[in-house]
Amino acid sequence: MSVLKEYRTVSEVVGPLMIVDQVAGVHYNELVDITLHNGARRKGQVLEVQGDKAMVQLFEGSTGINLAKTKVRFTGHPLELAVSEDMVGRIFDGMGQPIDGGPELIPEKYLDIDGQAINPVARDYPDEFIQTGISAIDHLNTLVRGQKLPVFSGSGLPHNELAAQIARQATVLNSDDNFAVVFAAMGITFEEAEFFMNDLRETGAIDRSVLFINLANDPAIERIATPRIALTTAEYLAYEKGMHVLVIMTDMTNYCEALREVSAARREVPGRRGYPGYLYTNLSTLYERAGRLIGKKGSVTQIPILTMPEDDITHPIPDLTGYITEGQIILSQELYKNGFRPPINVLPSLSRLKDKGSGEGKTRQDHAATMNQLFAAYAQGKQAKELAVVLGESALSETDKLYVAFTNRFEEEYINQGFYTNRSIEESLDLGWELLSILPRTELKRIKDDMLDRYLPKADTTMTKVFVAND
């Protein structure tokens, strides 16, 4: 066994970064043990090596470091996470240390938090439905096992409540396989952390969940490690324990801000909006860890959540995320102001794999047809409401008024289900048919006659109310 060298050659500390001179045999991503002059211990990771100089990123900050008296020891291995099946039901900090007062874990193995690149040939195609209990997702933007489907939110929108709802309700139908949720919260406040912990505990969802919490006052470097630690846990549970794992990561905007902070400390040339030029590559190292592997029973599905700065979908974070992932769920300020929860704007939302996880044998044979018809009817109803605002209700035809009635009920009953209503896919489909019955059968052009005969209820014209927007 080789003896690890100890260095006392720290030459500079800038923000979360430390420069160590006269090093030898040091490698990128190597874990570093740091001992301060008062005996306190901290950890870091090698970020860059040039000649005999190593740049180390500090996980616990640089406060109190004395250049002359600080001891640095390079461990010879990357940052690793101690993993165990007993992690399910536990709460950890952003570096994977238990914070729930429970017993210390007995590690089954240690895994590199950066994971291993997945050979594309080894990937299995995502094609199994995951039920979230939310109609706007399950019916209209179906989530498939092994998919990565982000949520694009805005400032002040209830994405935390939506994340907690998905964590509580998500399940794989028609399967006896174990299902687990790995929840990574990055840069959140104490209040938000309390909300997530209490919600999962009170509803019993903590029993199948692993929760990692990085607070806003924790170091930026820890924020960069948190999603990797969460994904390493998910991969272990999926590929070695055969579990279907849903990874929820919020807020990816805080993660990207931490990347920008470290990049600025390294004096790198900034890219768009000051973010590092490698932001796309860095995000891909997280998102591409979702998927299924041929010959492996488990799977990793991702729902990354991000807040769009200034509600700008062209901002680098949502823009680059959209290039890597397979769709997006977009939350609406307008729906939120009107009291609809969750405020999912279904028209610009998209799941690129929704057709792979729907249909007979997965959900129901009428899934795709009703989805397309609901989209078309809602879009036409929105246009009719806008026309009524400009020209008045009298300018609408009788059919247009029915579309307005459909649109209002669609938002009030279908989208506005609340954060504690868990709808099965059958309930979502049946509700969709009930709303479509408002419209004349001749308008339902995207559904075949045999399905209309089987599923379409007879419209009760006395119950149909027409609402025209006045704003």
Swiss-Prot record:
It comes from Streptococcus pyogenes serotype M18 (strain MGAS8232). GO terms for biological process: proton motive force-driven plasma membrane ATP synthesis. Keywords: ATP synthesis, Hydrogen ion transport, Ion transport, Transport. Disulfide bonds: none annotated. This is V-type ATP synthase beta chain. Belongs to the ATPase alpha/beta chains family. Pfam families: ATP-synt_ab, ATP-synt_ab_N, ATP-synt_VA_C. Produces ATP from ADP in the presence of a proton gradient across the membrane. The V-type beta chain is a regulatory subunit. PROSITE patterns: ATPASE_ALPHA_BETA.
